[in-house]
A protein has these predicted regions:
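ATP/pyrophosphate-binding catalytic subdomain of soluble kinases
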Residues: 1-53
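ATP/nucleoside-binding phosphotransfer catalytic cores, i.e., glycine-rich phosphate-binding loops
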Residues: 58-125
Length: 125
């Protein structure tokens, strides 16, 4: 298990079904930065809508004397959990797809475990 104290603007977690939105925008930024700094190739990360893994990216991680910024991108596979613990004294929130109306409080000491659900989303066209 990897443990890291972080200060950031949040974390984006995408399903295969949701990888065409915010995740795609973040990856475009990563590719642009890698190209600008001659850091090599950053692949397109596209998964099928039925992909049984989650992908996460930390938004604007800020390294300091007390925080790290190494664990900023990864996957959560079947039977794995990503555990987040809030250090926000107040105004910490969890929300889905940019909709704050259905947000949940996520303040200091609260723990969130994220994994793959048994239920599968379906896209109807």
């Amino acid at each position: 298990d990897v443990v890291e104290n972080q200060s950031s603007s949040g974390i984006i977690i995408s399903t295969g079904l949701g990888m065409t939105g915010w995740h795609k925008s973040i990856m475009a930024e990563f590719r642009g930065m890698a190209k600008a700094f001659n850091l090599g190739f950053v692949p397109e990360v596209e998964k099928g809508w039925d992909c049984r893994e989650l992908t996460f990216q930390v938004r604007e991680p800020y390294p300091s004397r007390f925080t790290q910024a190494e664990l900023v991108y990864g996957q959560i596979h079947e039977r794995e959990k990503l555990t987040l613990v809030s250090d926000m004294a107040e105004s910490g929130v969890i929300f889905s797809d940019g909709i704050l109306d259905d947000s949940l409080d996520f303040n200091a000491g609260m723990e969130l475990k994220i994994g793959i659900a048994d239920r599968v989303g379906r896209l109807v066209v």
